[in-house]
């Protein structure tokens, strides 16, 4: 392949060369590492074999960010780009279901809305079971410890299952607040309003910390018709006033519970977690 590139350069051909390789079970490029070092860009084509969409993710890029992704859907005419991944990820979201919260994460410069699902039920064993799909398992355990210590939810006797709908994987801290709300909503069996979206990092003291690019996240939520956006209070200044969507700033997890559940769909609009 190196010789092929030299030929193109000598003949003045201004074209790109694609080298197709395979990956190991660990998800790394197979064969000698020189294959990865000699190219300008390495792209991984990811996706669950049972899902209709695929994600094109850059892991090396000498000419730009590696945090950008492309979302494609397999149709009868072949792979087609999904122009609005947020709308695609939220399709099929159940209405008025407890344990379901919409959060916003960033993939590079692209805001993506996603549904975070949680199921909390009484454990029948001495050691409660915890499962996380699409989210770091240790992060979920950390956030549940915050809920138990700072909010007072007795989760040590409950099994908990947390999932990002659609099969994508997200490790950005901005989804912390969504995980917290989904677990609390499932524990109380009370749904959060359909028009509410949350984002923010959660610290061990229960504080809600700022995340990057809050303006883009709020703009994406407004574009998809959300009416309430719960954000870190320190981000309110950079977001400013946004017409058509109510932006609420919170300092702590406890404050988030009270504010978010004011907008719950049922059974009563002013019920709070305690």
Question: How should these model regions be labeled?
Answer:
Residues 1-8, 266-269, 273-274:
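Positively charged, low-complexity/disordered segments
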Residues 5-33, 37-261, 265:
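Peripheral, non-AAA+ core regions of ATP-driven protein-machinery
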């Amino acid at each position: 392949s190196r010789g092929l590139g030299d030929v193109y350069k000598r003949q003045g051909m201004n074209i790109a060369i694609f080298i197709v390789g395979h990956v190991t079970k660990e998800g790394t490029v197979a064969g000698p590492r020189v294959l990865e070092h000699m190219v300008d860009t390495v792209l991984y084509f990811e996706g669950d074999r049972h899902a209709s969409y695929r994600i094109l993710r850059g892991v090396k890029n000498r000419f730009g960010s590696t945090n950008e992704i492309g979302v494609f859907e397999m149709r009868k005419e072949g792979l087609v780009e999904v122009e609005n991944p947020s709308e695609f990820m939220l399709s099929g979201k159940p209405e008025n279901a407890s344990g379901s919260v919409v959060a916003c994460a960033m993939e590079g410069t692209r805001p993506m809305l996603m549904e975070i699902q949680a199921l909390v039920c009484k454990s029948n064993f001495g050691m409660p079971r915890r499962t996380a799909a699409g989210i770091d398992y240790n992060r979920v355990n950390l956030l549940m410890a915050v809920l138990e210590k700072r909010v007072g939810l007795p989760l040590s006797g409950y099994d908990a299952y947390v999932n990002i709908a659609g099969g994508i994987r997200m490790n950005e801290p901005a989804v912390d607040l969504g995980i917290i709300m989904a677990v609390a909503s499932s524990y109380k069996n009370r749904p959060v309003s359909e028009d509410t979206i949350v984002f923010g990092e959660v610290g061990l003291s229960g504080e809600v910390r700022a995340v990057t690019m809050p303006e883009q996240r709020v703009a994406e939520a407004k574009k998809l018709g959300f009416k309430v956006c719960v954000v870190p209070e320190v981000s309110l200044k950079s977001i400013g006033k946004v017409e058509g969507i109510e932006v609420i700033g919170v300092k702590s997890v406890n404050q988030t519970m009270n504010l978010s559940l004011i907008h719950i769909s049922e059974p009563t609009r002013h019920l709070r977690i305690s």
